[in-house]
């Protein structure tokens, strides 16, 4: 008998809660995503997260301890060697990743691009982080005239290749991306995803076509999601969750356009009758505010998210469990534009917790979440992680 019929897991992408013990190895001493945002905002207004116990993990400006938190609270330390989205999420679902995925804020190394040019017979232009629409405005015409390939990246571990469909036929573009995928399996380049980005149109009016193709990496082992799906439980992936796991262990995928759309979809799943896991990633914190080093925007986004939580609380059933966490930090006050190696918060709440919650022991790996989900549904336990299911008292 499952303790909880439905588990709703929410990952606030990049919402770290202070430097991890190994932060110095990552160049992240002093990083503190929520703490620094709270200082910048002269106090964060997150009353619903506070009720759950956020300030009991650690007091920050505007975020105080409460006498009787509604839920259980602690923080988690990442065990894997990376601080990227895929590593964090894969660890949450029970894997340990010892090869970090690389990000390329300065563009890709010359030796990689030289090899790609040699193997494809086409010149490469671009080679920088950019938005897909902006890079087409800037380089689309040159690409058409020269037959070169526009290579660009983002704040995530991706290598994207754009070409006009009438200049580089789709079949050729897909072959080129397969070559790039092979080359970037090398540990020194380890890229999470290669994406074909075909476009059409004329200068000043380029549009990306639906013929995008992703060459992702499947998780390096079976995750708790695979075990759930194989045991006929529902695994509803909201936002970029399905992409992060390359569809592995997913029974239904709901795309989102923004954090608020993500919260809408979460409310939709709360209205659904299912047994299993609903897994939401809220990416805006990271993509729009963390990497762009925008503490004001980040703080406002956190407050907007918090304001949506009463809708979630109102729809939770007695046999539901809500888990809120993050996958890494991305301190908008920290130098650079990269993620930061931090502890992440963990809040656990169910309406069945009539006495409220208390502090859980510090979690030594994000995989404790996967272990807890696995134990709840009686599926094979992951190799890594310790369940805290029995510590959650009704």
Swiss-Prot record:
Keywords: Cytoplasm, Isomerase, Manganese, Metal-binding
EC class of the enzyme, as a word: isomerase
GO cellular component, one term: cytosol
Gene Ontology BP, a term: 5-phosphoribose 1-diphosphate biosynthetic process
Binding site for Mn(2+) 2: 286, 291, 339
EC number(s) on file: 5.4.2.7
InterPro entries: Alkaline_phosphatase_core_sf (IPR017850), DeoB (IPR010045), Metalloenzyme (IPR006124), Phosphopentomutase_DeoB_cap_sf (IPR024052)
Localization: Cytoplasm
Transmembrane residue ranges: none
Reactions mediated catalytically: 2-deoxy-alpha-D-ribose 1-phosphate = 2-deoxy-D-ribose 5-phosphate; alpha-D-ribose 1-phosphate = D-ribose 5-phosphate
Annotated cofactor note: Binds 2 manganese ions.
Residues in coiled coil: none
Pathway in which the depicted protein is active: Carbohydrate degradation; 2-deoxy-D-ribose 1-phosphate degradation; D-glyceraldehyde 3-phosphate and acetaldehyde from 2-deoxy-alpha-D-ribose 1-phosphate: step 1/2
Keyword Protein biosynthesis: no
GO molecular function, one term: manganese ion binding
Listed cofactors: Mn(2+)
Residues given in the record as Mn(2+) 1 binding sites: 13, 327-328
Pfam families in UniProt: Metalloenzyme
Domain of life: Bacteria
Keyword Metal-binding among UniProt keywords: yes
PANTHER family associated with the record: PHOSPHOPENTOMUTASE
Similarity section: Belongs to the phosphopentomutase family.
Entry function: Isomerase that catalyzes the conversion of deoxy-ribose 1-phosphate (dRib-1-P) and ribose 1-phosphate (Rib-1-P) to deoxy-ribose 5-phosphate (dRib-5-P) and ribose 5-phosphate (Rib-5-P), respectively.
Protein name: Phosphopentomutase
Gene name of the record: deoB
């Amino acid at each position: 008998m499952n303790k909880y019929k439905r588990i709703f897991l929410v990952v606030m992408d990049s919402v770290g809660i202070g430097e991890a013990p190994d932060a110095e190895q990552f160049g992240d001493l002093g990083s503190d995503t929520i703490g620094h945002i709270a200082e910048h905002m002269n106090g964060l207004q997150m009353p619903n997260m506070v009720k759950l116990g956020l300030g009991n993990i650690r007091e920050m400006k505007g975020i105080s301890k409460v006498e009787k938190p509604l839920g259980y609270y602690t923080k988690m330390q990442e065990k894997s060697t990376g601080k990227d989205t895929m590593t964090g999420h894969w660890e949450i679902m029970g894997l340990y990743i010892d090869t970090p995925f690389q990000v390329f804020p300065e563009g890709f190394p010359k030796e990689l691009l030289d090899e790609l040019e040699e193997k494809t017979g086409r010149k490469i232009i671009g080679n920088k982080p950019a938005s897909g629409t902006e890079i087409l405005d800037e380089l689309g015409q040159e690409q058409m005239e020269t037959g070169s390939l526009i290579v660009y990246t983002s704040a995530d571990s991706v290598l994207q290749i754009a070409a006009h469909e009438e200049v580089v036929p789709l079949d050729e573009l897909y072959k080129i991306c397969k070559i790039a995928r092979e080359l970037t399996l090398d540990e020194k380049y380890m890229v999470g995803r290669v994406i074909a980005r075909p476009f059409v149109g004329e200068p000043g009016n380029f549009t990306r076509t639906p013929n995008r193709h992703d060459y992702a990496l499947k998780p390096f082992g079976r995750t708790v999601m695979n075990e759930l799906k194989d045991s006929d439980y529902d695994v509803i992936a909201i936002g970029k969750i399905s992409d992060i796991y390359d569809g592995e262990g997913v029974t239904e995928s709901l795309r989102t356009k923004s954090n608020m759309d993500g919260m809408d979809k979460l409310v939709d799943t709360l209205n659904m009758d299912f047994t299993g896991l609903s897994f939401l990633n809220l990416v805006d914190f990271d993509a729009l505010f963390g990497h762009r080093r925008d503490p004001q925007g980040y703080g406002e986004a956190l407050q907007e998210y918090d304001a949506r939580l009463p809708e979630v609380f109102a729809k939770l059933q007695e046999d539901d469990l809500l888990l809120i966490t993050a996958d890494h930090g991305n301190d908008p006050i920290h130098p650079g534009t990269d993620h930061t190696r931090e502890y992440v918060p963990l809040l656990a709440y169910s309406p069945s917790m009539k006495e409220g919650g208390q502090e859980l022991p510090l979690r030594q790996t994000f995989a404790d979440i996967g272990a807890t989900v696995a134990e709840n549904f009686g599926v094979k336990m992951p190799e890594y992680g310790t369940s805290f299911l029995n510590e959650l008292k009704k």
